[in-house]
Swiss-Prot record:
Required cofactor names: [4Fe-4S] cluster
SMART domains reported in the protein's UniProt record: Elp3
Listed name of the protein: Lipoyl synthase
Gene transcribed to yield this protein: lipA
The keyword Iron-sulfur is annotated on this UniProt entry: yes
CC annotations in GO: cytoplasm
Pathway: Protein modification; protein lipoylation via endogenous pathway; protein N(6)-(lipoyl)lysine from octanoyl-[acyl-carrier-protein]
Originating species: Bacillus cereus (strain ATCC 14579 / DSM 31 / CCUG 7414 / JCM 2152 / NBRC 15305 / NCIMB 9373 / NCTC 2599 / NRRL B-3711)
Free-text cofactor note: Binds 2 [4Fe-4S] clusters per subunit. One cluster is coordinated with 3 cysteines and an exchangeable S-adenosyl-L-methionine.
Broad class of where this protein is predominantly found: cytoplasm
Amino acid sequence: MTKQTEYKRKPEWLKIKLNTNENYTGLKKMMRSKNLHTVCEEAKCPNIHECWAVRKTATFMILGAVCTRACRFCAVKTGLPTELDLQEPERVADSVVQMGLKHVVITAVARDDLKDGGAAVFAETVRAVRRKNPFTSIEVLPSDMGGVEENLKMLMDAKPDILNHNIETVRRLSDRVRARAKYERSLEFLRRAKEMQPDIPTKSSIMVGLGETREDLIEAMDDLRANNVDILTLGQYLQPSKKHLPVLKYYPPAEFAELKEIALSKGFSHCEAGPLVRSSYHADEQVRSAKEKTAGS
């Protein structure tokens, strides 16, 4: 077994405390009863116990649980997706009420089988949550929806509080990590979102540990800022299974702190960086920080 394919042992700083209190079990039961999915479970997020048990937050995953893409880092199931569930937006909105969320993140599997990439259901979910939860801030995390401008406009017209779209990795590694998504297309998606709704903060995320260099990461930060992205999250890539891309490096907390300082020096309004940081980690704090800085500028 070569160093490139070795299933590396996680360092101490990546070990997490499991907490399965009544908040955790209650949320799990509610999701099952409403036939809803969360990216927390489907993508095997390491923060699920903190978010569900302590912070009582969750990221809803709409448009089913089967993705039409097969990115080599992702644990979400791939294959032929299910039919659209047109009642899903209302069930998500009802769940936000039941959970008493102040901030909700709505993401989705990629639906390349749909002409609009799922934009209509995405937009209706935003509107449904807004109707039933007028004081809840809403963050959306869509795929690139095929790079079709009309699809993005449909979503942005629903006026989410924050638009999040992840480039996932650096330019040099993008084709290997997510072959059916394109680095430049993601940058264009983020740029267009800001052009359509200048007052809505935009956000993106990068995983580290896939073989990128410091120079690669700085280039990616510059690319995001050149396309007016406001918020950046940086987290450690964790190999979901031996079928996925291997971890080539575990970044220590101190290196994440350095990367955060670099990101802030580039002009990002907020940067969340750490071994266990994921795109939706402390999302409520990120959107609040971005809005405060926008209001003060």
